[in-house]
Amino acid sequence: MFCYFLSKSYDDCSRYYIISNMAFYFPVYDSDSPTTVHHDERKESWRSHGFIVCLHIRCCICCKYNSKIKKPSLNIALRIQSLKIIKILIFQFYSTKPLWDKNSPEYKQLRSEIEATKRDEEVKNGELIDPNVTTEDEKL
């Protein structure tokens, strides 16, 4: 299996996939104009850091595997709205399919960033009480 299904029905039912254990060329969509494609000619490996590159270009690559040419066809790439979503998707992927050593500094750093992001989102959505915020009642 080359595509790992991670999440669906997020922002107009977009679907996000990570291609694992493969190396290929991928397009980079301009963050201001999703119809403009800039080709990155460097070969990247999803297993090592190819997907992490997407953290910096604010997009999520959605590739459909083409067995004939032994590489994904690059006909689909989805613009991502938030870096946080990408980080969460990476975290979910590595949690279920651990490709990194969980004791490595990279994994620990990503995990702490994701946990902080999730806490921030929960506080913002009122699902979690921020211990740093006191209400008027608590002050009395």
Curated annotation (Swiss-Prot):
Region Disordered: start-end pairs: 121-140
The protein, known as: Putative uncharacterized protein C23C4.04c
Organism encoding this protein: Schizosaccharomyces pombe (strain 972 / ATCC 24843)
